[in-house]
């Protein structure tokens, strides 16, 4: 469960999941995902990590809808028998998205078009907490800290603190700061280029969310000042734990899913 929680955290910290579906991410991989730039966190999602969560959600959905009589394992076995073996026999036997969806519905006996529309072709958040619950697992954000920040990422470049990413909708983005700007000072105090991310966080910790600060930057050798309203730079840290009020049926479902006894 720890590994699943890590994947959930990796996906939930990316803003691109609201912009790009995993179907689009897969299609655009060679022209976008493997050619990342400063706007990548705002625009793209990994079809590897989020794709694994969609597969998890599909597995749990099938298990719930069939009383644990069917799972994603049954779907994968059917795909192998109908298509996979032909590949190793030297036969070209591809499969379309529509055919794959039809097999999933056939094996599970469930109507899953809404699932496909929302989570494969859409950017709707996966209701993982809701799906985990019948398996006796609770999903909670353990990070309750309120941290004032600019919603940027910085790195050291020579003696400069350079802004590498500006997260869309964040404090710096609303103020007008851009990726590539050299961050000089906050309220007249120099931002050190020595371990800049840590030092910037420490410098901003003196403030509260909602306070205004003056950020000074160089943009192509032009000195610029921006008034920034600090926002809560919350980084989720989801954890998965066994539910305190689990029932015997929840425990049984979890054991069938994880294929282990407790």
Regions found by a protein language model. Give the residues of each.
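C-terminal recognition in membrane/secretory proteostasis and scaffolding
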Residues: 2-262
């Amino acid at each position: 469960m720890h590994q699943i929680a890590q994947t959930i955290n990796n996906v939930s910290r990316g803003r691109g999941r609201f912009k790009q579906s995993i179907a689009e991410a897969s299609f655009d991989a060679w022209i976008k995902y493997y050619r990342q730039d400063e706007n990548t966190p705002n625009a793209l999602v990994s079809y590897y990590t989020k794709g694994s969560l969609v597969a998890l959600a599909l597995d749990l959905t099938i298990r719930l809808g069939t009383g644990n009589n069917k799972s994603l394992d049954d779907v994968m076995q059917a795909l192998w028998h109908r298509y996979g073996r032909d590949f190793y026999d030297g036969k070209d036997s591809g499969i379309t998205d529509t055919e794959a969806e039809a097999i999933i519905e056939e094996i599970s006996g469930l109507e899953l078009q809404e699932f496909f529309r929302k989570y494969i072709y859409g950017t709707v958040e996966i209701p993982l907490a809701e799906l985990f619950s019948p398996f006796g697992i609770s999903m909670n954000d353990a990070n309750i800290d309120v941290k004032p920040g600019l919603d940027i990422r910085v790195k050291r470049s020579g003696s400069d603190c350079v802004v590498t990413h500006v997260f869309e909708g964040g404090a710096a983005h609303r103020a007008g700061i851009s990726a590539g700007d050299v961050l000089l000072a906050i309220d007249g105090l120099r931002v050190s280029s020595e371990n800049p991310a840590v030092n910037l966080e420490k410098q901003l910790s003196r403030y509260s969310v909602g306070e205004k600060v003056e950020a000074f930057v160089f943009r192509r050798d032009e000195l610029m000042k921006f008034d920034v309203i600090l926002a809560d730079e919350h980084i989720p840290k989801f954890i998965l734990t066994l539910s305190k009020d689990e029932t015997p049926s929840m425990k049984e479902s979890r054991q069938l899913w994880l294929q282990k006894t407790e």
